[in-house]
Amino acid sequence: MIYAVFIFNNKGKPRLTKFYTPIDESIQQKLIGDIYAAVSTRPPTACNFLESNLIAGKNRIIYRQYATLYFVFVVDEGESELGILDLIQVFVEALDRCFNNVCELDLVFKFQEIHAILAEVVSGGLVLETNLNEIVLAAQNQMPKTKRSNAMPFSNTLSSFATRF
């Protein structure tokens, strides 16, 4: 089960927080700070998995850094670490396709669309969809027509994504 999903910038400012388990808001704020501190202090050569007891007993923090953003999933021991890393990759690629070179400002100003894309991937702490084309299609169908017309074609997206990361 996925307990929470976070996106932080490199200064520790949360750009997306989604908890799939009920936790008091004061505890949520402490968890966000603790998770960012644990992830941001690790050297780039370190493994992207951390053992943790922060949420619901024993769990794992799985993260990946893209440019100035940390994408963090907190999961139970039953989830595959490599599967979650792939899920993070799919989520980032979906964001990149939907927002034409996604950046931190997209996360700030288009947070509803970001949450909608995340809801296509994860719901209630369970993975719903991993097919990138299905996720992008569902997300684009939810966006207003003006935003959809600005979406980048599929062939250009992968090449721009590969050069950015």
Curated annotation (Swiss-Prot):
SUPFAM superfamilies: SNARE-like (SSF64356). Keywords: Cytoplasmic vesicle, Golgi apparatus, Membrane, Protein transport, Transport. One of its GO terms (cellular component) is nucleus. InterPro entries: AP_complex_ssu (IPR016635), AP_mu_sigma_su (IPR022775), Clathrin_sm-chain_CS (IPR000804), Longin-like_dom_sf (IPR011012). It is a peripheral membrane protein. One of its GO terms (biological process) is Golgi to vacuole transport. It is found in: Golgi apparatus; Cytoplasmic vesicle membrane. Pfam families: Clat_adaptor_s. Adaptor protein complex 3 (AP-3) is a heterotetramer composed of 2 large adaptins (apl5 and apl6), a medium adaptin (apm3) and a small adaptin (aps3). Belongs to the adaptor complexes small subunit family. Part of the AP-3 complex, an adaptor-related complex which is not clathrin-associated. The complex is associated with the Golgi region as well as more peripheral structures. It facilitates the budding of vesicles from the Golgi membrane and may be directly involved in trafficking to the vacuole. This is AP-3 complex subunit sigma.
